[in-house]
Design a protein with these regions (language model features):
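Positively charged, helix-rich recognition surfaces that bind polyanionic ligands
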Residues: 101-104, 116-342
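Acidic carboxylate diad motif detector
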Residues: 6-116
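N-terminal cap/recognition module
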Residues: 1-5
Length: 342
């Protein structure tokens, strides 16, 4: 079913016989079409075994999104402190300076308003002006980045970025999250007793559910902020190129002992944001194959150690070369000659 045929069916057949859903007409017509497209994508991913069966999203409870597009020149006009959204008008932004403004030459194509943990967020899709893409002047030597679980990232120049999940800040929030989840579970058990007619305490589930959502959102924001600051510091040195490894994250997630640690590192988000930032700064991003022996190869003589174990944190070669395992891998990635440009 195309978007046009869906609109004809919705307006001429469904809504006249279902007046309780008349609120659908309050939003943009393209927003309803986009919702059907998202549903089609969800079922496609389900049949490809990429995700679970799609769940119904109730508009007043679930973390749902409202999609909008630019229909005329006056729509989607963004200023530093507010944005003009179709059917809503001017909406004030709490955090200023995050969205690209129209006066600076950015052209907004579409956007979405989402609700997460009791807060509303807006994201936009824009056309990047040519003046924003920087030239390749005054660049320094290239760097290699080795991502891992012990340390988040080890650079070929010796810079080490710690694992944010091992800090006391994250551990304290995760401890609060575990307690909040246990409390929510007990409330659901009390609700079952109340339905059976047994004596139980009144369960205020929605408030506790919101507390759990806020803790999840807080932890996620701390990790995302750390990734953004790490990438900004890497790109600030203006290297001629940045080389990373194409990690097999899907295979790493199959290890039940490491899956939680791999998921919390957010390697895919790091790669996508690094790719975007390198494009803005005019830096070449090189991606080396996952089969490249970056950790097993000696950076001094090129010999490959086949007996290297994961517990061996210091790389020792027969030629006398001794180096930290992750630093050796980062140096090999920097000097790799077989790669793809992202």
């Amino acid at each position: 079913m195309s978007g046009k045929s869906f609109s004809v069916w919705l307006n001429n057949e469904y809504l006249p016989t279902h007046p309780e859903y008349s609120w659908i007409k309050e939003v943009s017509s393209k927003a309803t079409k986009h919702a059907v497209e998202c549903g089609c994508t969800a079922f496609t991913r389900f049949f490809k075994h990429q995700s679970g069966f799609p769940k119904f999203k109730k508009k007043d409870i679930s973390d749902v999104k409202m999609y909008f597009v630019k229909n005329n020149p006056k729509d989607c006009y963004c200023e530093r402190h507010r944005i003009n959204i179709p059917t809503l008008g001017w909406v004030r932004l709490k955090e200023k300076g995050y969205l690209p403004t129209t006066k600076d030459g950015w052209r907004i194509r579409s956007g979405a308003v989402s609700k997460k943990a009791g807060r509303y967020y807006v994201s936009v899709l824009v056309d990047v002006p040519d003046s924003q893409v920087k030239s390749k002047e005054d660049q320094t030597e290239g760097i290699g980045i080795d991502l891992g679980l012990k340390e988040f990232a080890v650079l070929s120049n010796g810079k080490i970025y710690k694992n944010i999940n091992k800090t006391s800040r994250i551990k304290k929030l995760e401890k609060q999250l575990r307690r909040a989840q246990r409390c929510l579970s007990r409330k659901y058990e009390n609700l079952k007793k109340m339905k059976k007619g047994e004596s139980a305490q009144r369960a205020n589930i929605q408030k506790q559910k919101l507390r759990v959502q806020k803790l999840h959102q807080r932890i996620n924001q701390i990790r995302t902020d750390y990734i953004n600051k790490t990438i900004a510091e890497m790109v600030k040195t203006k290297p001629s190129h940045i080389t990373i490894e194409d990690l097999n994250v899907k295979g790493m997630m199959k290890n039940r002992h490491l899956s939680k640690a791999v998921e919390s590192e957010k390697f895919y988000e790091f790669r996508e944001k690094l790719m975007m930032k390198c494009h803005e700064e005019g830096i070449e991003l090189r991606v080396v194959s996952r089969w490249y022996p970056s950790s097993r190869k000696c950076h001094s003589c090129g010999c490959i150690r086949k007996d290297l174990k994961l517990s061996d944190r210091i790389y020792r070669c027969s030629c006398g070369y001794i180096e930290d395992r992750d630093r050796n891998a980062a140096l090999n990635l920097k000097d790799a000659v077989t790669y793809e440009i992202a």
